[in-house]
């Protein structure tokens, strides 16, 4: 075996500052399970019955037990929407518990909670699940966003989609993906650990609502990427950090992906064929 295949390190482009994690071992990661679903009860990762569950990733992108998998339900055919508010609340509570636990580690400066749903965005197992990466630094994008005083749009107007209690969802005005949603509490909360009982219920209801609308948009399960932006755990001062959720999909129409191509990659300027206000109108009508 070539020893280079086990290479794992972090490199930074000297001119652009881009951080690249070189993880040779992930080339050996199976694209699809060879026998049965490892996340179903009795499978490799879930020998006992469960409602929600987390475990360390067998194919981590980073060393030091800083990559985890979160199972939303034992039901293989479920969706986040079919969990209902009670099931979604269980997931949120587990997300919050893992954020608080990982965030106390000296080698963790930022906890990213995320989901890739569908093979179109890289999911290799269909069972409902998400992941957590615990970074030993604050990555550039959330650092810039949270450090710049980001706040939810107080008056999104035609870009408004839905609201539940103290949480609301709207389409961002300058979305880089054809489908994009921003979810946030109306009053500042820095991270999931600070979100109170009512706030967690409102977030659960809003996630169940908007993810259901997204699946109804094209009358089929929508591939999406979802992630939380929240206070870094590096011990620094983040007085303006405001918890928020982003959901994006590459589909510009049913089954048709919009590819981020050469001009956009080269210049980091984007061309979105979907008008945010029209997307918001469609999603409102699906409520």
Task: Give the positions of each predicted feature.
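Extended C-terminal subregions enriched in glycine
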Residues: 206-219
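Gly/Ser/Thr-rich active-site loops/lids in small-molecule metabolic enzymes
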Residues: 200-206
């Amino acid at each position: 075996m070539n020893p280079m295949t086990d290479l794992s390190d972090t490199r930074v482009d000297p001119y652009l500052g881009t951080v690249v994690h070189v993880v040779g071992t992930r080339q050996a990661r199976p694209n699809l399970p060879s026998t049965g679903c490892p996340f179903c009860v009795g499978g490799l990762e879930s020998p006992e019955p469960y409602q929600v569950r987390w475990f360390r990733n067998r194919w981590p992108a980073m060393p030091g037990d800083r990559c985890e998998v979160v199972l939303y339900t034992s039901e293989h055919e479920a969706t986040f929407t079919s969990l209902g508010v009670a099931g979604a609340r269980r997931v949120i509570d587990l997300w919050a518990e893992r954020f608080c636990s990982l965030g106390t580690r000296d080698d963790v400066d930022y906890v990213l909670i995320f989901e890739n749903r569908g093979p179109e965005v890289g999911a290799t197992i269909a069972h409902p699940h998400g992941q957590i990466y615990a970074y030993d630094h604050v990555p550039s994008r959330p650092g810039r966003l949270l450090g710049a005083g980001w706040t939810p749009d107080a008056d999104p107007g035609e870009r408004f989609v839905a609201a539940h209690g103290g949480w609301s969802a709207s389409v961002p005005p300058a979305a880089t993906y054809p489908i994009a949603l921003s979810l946030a509490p109306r009053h500042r909360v820095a991270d999931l650990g600070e979100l109170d009982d009512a706030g967690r219920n409102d977030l659960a209801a809003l996630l169940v609502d908007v993810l259901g609308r997204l699946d109804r948009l094209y009358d089929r399960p929508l591939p999406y990427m979802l992630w939380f932006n929240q206070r870094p755990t590096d011990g620094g001062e983040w007085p303006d950090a405001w918890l928020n959720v982003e959901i994006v999909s590459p589909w510009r129409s049913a089954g048709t992906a919009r590819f981020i191509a050469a001009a956009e990659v080269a210049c980091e300027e984007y061309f979105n064929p979907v008008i945010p206000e029209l997307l918001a109108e469609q999603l409102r009508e699906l409520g």
